[in-house]
């Protein structure tokens, strides 16, 4: 791919000025149009060292309204990024609808030549990274993002010349490092590695665009042309939408899981007191051990309304150092959340190494309430099962322990708790009209829960059904399950 492309293409100054002015006007107009239709755009620059990424980004943003674009410097893996799954920072950079984000380096950084050797990545880890980045890009495309990936290609001699020029000036010499020089020294080897990366991460929906960048004038014009053409293509698709592709229903007969669970398990008061103290002390010790070993965990609470999630979370965390955990309650998305990919608001809350995050409701709302209440079209919530599994796999690959609890009560117990809340002034705020409406759709929710258990229960991110008619039993079961899993993970 790269070996067949001559990076020496050039452009005369007069032609450059004419084209630059035309393209600047066009990009300014396109920015207004993409804002009006709510098209989020991610422009990714990648390429050889000294290929001119900074220069070309500066020229690109010149005609744009600075209120509606953001430039992100993404290259260096600082401590914060190293303590998160490697795609975490790129999730945090995603623009809202109608805005542009420009990244000076791509999410492919860890698998670039030189960098992967620096981190000592195995072939299996590299294979996992390819899978993760392709899944990430597909998820964004499916959600309506336009991703424009630009690879700036220069020759070995041109790179050596630019390195020499940088080294001469005190104001730019700091930008050079041993890895840059090694890249030029091993140019042919790195060329083959870059070709492999482009081949394995270029898809019909999210292709790479190679920019011949020996001549900066030619490169700037091609970059602007490419971006302009891609935006116009996507705007045309938005203005003339195709009907959504229907996802074929699986022929597999889904198992009726919840109906087989009897939520009446109990524990005596004396046994509860003994086990509560034991497991809370164990949880405290494991929380400290997690911090020392830099292991993180995500615990998801889902369940029927009034199943006891809040009290369960309180008992789980009561002895844990509050600096090491966070509880994230999830409600309807706020405007800034609704304007991004639906997983964005969850990814930005994922714990850094050594910490625990507990989600009181979660990303599974997409295949529960959004499905039942017709808040999301079927073709969108149906693809969420795959997206959720991919996200959880990415977290686990980083070393995150994931446990997902469904707190299960029967319909009679829910009614009793609803009535108790209605009668008790101190609990009346816990019961809403929405709770009663959800109760009327019990059978629909049960069917949706059975499907999510079937499609998203994995060995690395398992679902645990917690019999919760008796709250004390449920609290001990969760404490025991969590402490056992954390203990196993840190052996």
Where are these regions (language model features)?
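Glycine-rich phosphate-binding loop of ATP-dependent small-molecule kinases
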Residues: 1-491
